[in-house]
């Protein structure tokens, strides 16, 4: 990742975990879902992935581990986290104690058919280009058992040129993404757009706001948090203008034979 994304997913992740740890356990999951882990999105994916208690679920680009912890609490899956940034790995281990491997999504260090299911939330656009995005999808297919499912949250370019996109992001079009999915030997079985994400419950919102207030009280003057806030603002503006769209997709790995 380049500088702006490293600030958000490494340094700020580490700081966010410190804040959540000081505020208490009820803040851990909302704080660690900072970014793409909205409850409505996670609930939709869990409904369509149909995980069962005890199944192994790989979270690729897991960040601080909030979505994986949410899934484990709701469904009883056993999460395995894969995350490239050391600060986010430390945050996930500190808050949830889940197994986490520092690794790139284009070269997952797991054997073929290791897990029952996986998800990858808002990560595809952080790859440095189309070849890396195809590699990520290929790795997801490789590590999931035949007949298993993969959940994606993806941000897609709805226009040829984006106005002032966040640095380091590469947004495929919907057509490009679905071509990549087919080339990886995967099948999209469920697709939905999230133009207007349902507002989280009030207690969730309150905890997120408390974490943000304390994060900015402690670190608001730092260049790392300023950069992360700027990246988030650019992202939000593109979504609001319709230049970017959010999709949730469930993919199926073909059954053996």
Predicted regions and their residues:
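C-terminal helical/coil "lid" or tail adjacent to the Rossmann-like core of SAM-dependent
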Residues: 194-242
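Short, glycine-/aromatic-enriched active-site segment of Class I SAM-dependent methyltransferases
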Residues: 151-170
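N-terminal, positively charged/glycine-rich alpha-helical extensions of SAM-dependent methyltransferases
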Residues: 1-26
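Short alpha-helix
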Residues: 170-185
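Conserved alpha-helix/loop element of class I SAM-dependent methyltransferases that forms part
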Residues: 35-53
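Class I SAM-dependent methyltransferase SAM/SAH-binding core
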Residues: 56-107
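A short glycine-rich, Lys/Arg-flanked "PGG" loop and its adjoining helix->strand segment in the class I
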Residues: 134-149
